[in-house]
């Protein structure tokens, strides 16, 4: 989260699930919906989670304990239809998620960096 604050990222795109076929694939680095968790000097509140066909969109509010840091809303898009050792059956959900990401970037400022 420190990288998100330092680089002023407003959108995170994630292409992995946390678990696949019973194996851990990615560390869950966010709190559950409507919960707050502190990560070092950054407090993260998961304001909501919306499930779309093939992906999730989470909206976080972040605060830093350093008053010089700029914080606020951060959106996370997590594609959940990519199989572990293969490719998706169709690209339509991934393309749809991409359109949502672009729309989000336009709404919050087109120069917003993205962590992929």
From Swiss-Prot:
Superkingdom of the organism of origin: Eukaryota
Family to which this protein belongs: Belongs to the protein-tyrosine phosphatase family.
Alphabetized InterPro entries for the sequence: Prot-tyrosine_phosphatase-like, Protein-Tyr_Phosphatase, PTP_cat
Keyword check for Hydrolase: yes
Residues where substrate binds: 84
Protein name: Tyrosine-protein phosphatase 20
Molecular function GO labels: protein tyrosine phosphatase activity
Segments forming domain Tyrosine-protein phosphatase: 1-116
Keyword set includes Hydrolase: yes
Species of the source: Styela plicata (Wrinkled sea squirt)
Catalyzed reactions per annotation: O-phospho-L-tyrosyl-[protein] + H2O = L-tyrosyl-[protein] + phosphate
One Pfam family here: Y_phosphatase
The protein's Enzyme Commission number: 3.1.3.48
Keywords noted in UniProt: Hydrolase, Protein phosphatase
């Amino acid at each position: 989260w420190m990288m998100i604050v330092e680089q002023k990222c407003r959108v995170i795109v994630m292409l992995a699930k946390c678990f696949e076929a019973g194996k851990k694939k990615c560390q869950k680095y966010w709190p559950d919906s409507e919960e707050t968790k502190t990560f070092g000097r950054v407090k993260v509140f998961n304001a909501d989670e919306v499930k779309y066909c093939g992906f999730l969109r989470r909206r976080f509010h972040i605060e830093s304990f350093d008053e010089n840091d700029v914080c606020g809303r951060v959106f996370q898009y997590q594609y959940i239809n990519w199989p572990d050792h293969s490719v998706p059956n169709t690209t339509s959900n991934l393309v749809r998620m991409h359109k949502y990401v672009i729309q989000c970037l336009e709404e919050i400022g087109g120069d917003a960096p993205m962590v992929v």
